[in-house]
Amino acid sequence: MSGFPRSVVVGGSGAVGGMFAGLLREAGSRTLVVDLVPPPGRPDACLVGDVTAPGPELAAALRDADLVLLAVHEDVALKAVAPVTRLMRPGALLADTLSVRTGMAAELAAHAPGVQHVGLNPMFAPAAGMTGRPVAAVVTRDGPGVTALLRLVEGGGGRPVRLTAEEHDRTTAATQALTHAVILSFGLALARLGVDVRALAATAPPPHQVLLALLARVLGGSPEVYGDIQRSNPRAASARRALAEALRSFAALIGDDPDRAEDPDRADDPDRTDNPGHPGGCDGAGNLDGVFEELRRLMGPELAAGQDHCQELFRTLHRTDDEGEKDR
């Protein structure tokens, strides 16, 4: 048994809500899916209702529920906190799947300080499956319901990782907002270079193949979802600024002049200050020594594990047991 004889999943017709609804049902919970619109061709698959203004049938379900899980957009979830928690019985658990935590923490403090609550943010696409994958868990108010739900996630193969609301938003600004910005900026740079992607794919060393694959994966997703991640996290703008500043620092380190457009015909011009032979030139390799040392310290004990992971990834790309590409 799931620990939740009766559960309500709001937004359960969507990918994330559907994943949790399935997990609850498999564990024996009587799970009611609530949505504004039923899935196409399945008018009886859910209770149609507005969780921000519950009608009589939805209100009754919320009163009886041992768990109410909000798998909806942040705006809807925040508006739902007050009306939903007023209906929930003592001891019931409120959960949500928001990708930003600080707003929900403030809303709960204002309207439902005594309600058990945990936020679950699956750090993967639901289609990939939960087995072995991390689920960020932010506990606002602990209790038996929180323990039961985290145990249910573990039983479904997930790996709950506990974070505070502040830690969550700071971490996901790097793991999601920064990562997506890097990948899409890489694609924009390719477009500006005017390169033939077919030629790239045919000649690319493993690191470039991985970046092309990541770009292709992101482009297979929803622009709305990726845009929402960039806009909703209060720390995402800082992550993008850090990326832009890091690229400017790297360019300066190598010897680029940001005020002068690159001219391929001047590559060997002895008067260029970024020419290694110029008295004021820049020895990029020498300057990179310090960068490499700094980043090796940043990686710490994860450096060796990351190198092993990358080697395994490259082997998978080439379907071989011996991958010799190391520096390119």
Swiss-Prot record:
Belongs to the prephenate/arogenate dehydrogenase family. Its EC number is 1.3.1.121. It comes from Streptomyces venezuelae (strain ATCC 10712 / CBS 650.69 / DSM 40230 / JCM 4526 / NBRC 13096 / PD 04745). Pathway: Antibiotic biosynthesis. Disulfide bonds: none annotated. It catalyses: 4-amino-4-deoxyprephenate + NAD(+) = 3-(4-aminophenyl)pyruvate + CO2 + NADH + H(+). The lineage of its organism: Bacteria, Bacillati, Actinomycetota, Actinomycetes, Kitasatosporales. Residues 254-288 are annotated as: Disordered. PROSITE patterns: PDH_ADH. Pfam families: PDH_C. It comes from the Bacteria. It is an enzyme of class 1 (oxidoreductase). Involved in chloramphenicol biosynthesis. Probably catalyzes the formation of 3-(4-aminophenyl)pyruvate from 4-amino-4-deoxyprephenate. One of its GO terms (biological process) is antibiotic biosynthetic process. GO terms for molecular function: NAD+ binding; prephenate dehydrogenase (NAD+) activity; prephenate dehydrogenase (NADP+) activity. Keywords: Antibiotic biosynthesis, Oxidoreductase. This is 4-amino-4-deoxyprephenate dehydrogenase. Residues 6-284 form the Prephenate/arogenate dehydrogenase domain. Residues 257-275 have a biased composition (Basic and acidic residues). Disruption phenotype: Disruption of the gene causes severe decrease in chloramphenicol production.
